[in-house]
Amino acid sequence: MTAPSCAFPVQFRQPSVSGLSQITKSLYISNGVAANNKLMLSSNQITMVINVSVEVVNTLYEDIQYMQVPVADSPNSRLCDFFDPIADHIHSVEMKQGRTLLHCAAGVSRSAALCLAYLMKYHAMSLLDAHTWTKSCRPIIRPNSGFWEQLIHYEFQLFGKNTVHMVSSPVGMIPDIYEKEVRLMIPL
């Protein structure tokens, strides 16, 4: 696995689950509560907040731009419609020396999926490497199965091959990277 070229060296990166989790020098993920914390936003020099939810309302602060991506955390939601536009926007903010906070309600599924799409597109990371890296920065990420299917399709579009596959399990279709975990939880 190769780290994103603009990521902090591992020794400076601290995994976070409650506050803002730094993924690259210009991209962070959080939950809705942290996204409305003025001190967290200002101390991390956030210039753009992308709200990937229908249920979280942002408190608007001066000097921060806001974007809404109204997608429910449902396997049937078409988050893939936003993969390219949001990845492009995150990249555009970075090119202007800005910092983006990507958040949903919990900072687990929707924002994580869009982060993975961005890392694949702009850091040429495989889906597997993007997931491994993002999980090392924010251990609680877990996109829903529908988002995984969309990410797998996107990876194939970008690179012509897949590093993650959906497999059948006692709890339904899951990405193969969760297979061992599910088997430990549900003995066959």
UniProtKB/Swiss-Prot annotation:
GO terms for cellular component: cytoplasm; mitochondrial inner membrane; nucleoplasm; nucleus. Optimum pH is 6.0. One of its GO terms (molecular function) is phosphatase activity. Residues 19-160 form the Tyrosine-protein phosphatase domain. It is found in: Cytoplasm; Nucleus; Mitochondrion inner membrane. It is a peripheral membrane protein. PANTHER family: DUAL SPECIFICITY PROTEIN PHOSPHATASE 18 (PTHR46495:SF2), DUAL SPECIFICITY PROTEIN PHOSPHATASE 21 (PTHR46495). Belongs to the protein-tyrosine phosphatase family. Non-receptor class dual specificity subfamily. This is Dual specificity protein phosphatase 18. The lineage of its organism: Eukaryota, Metazoa, Chordata, Craniata, Vertebrata. The gene is DUSP18.
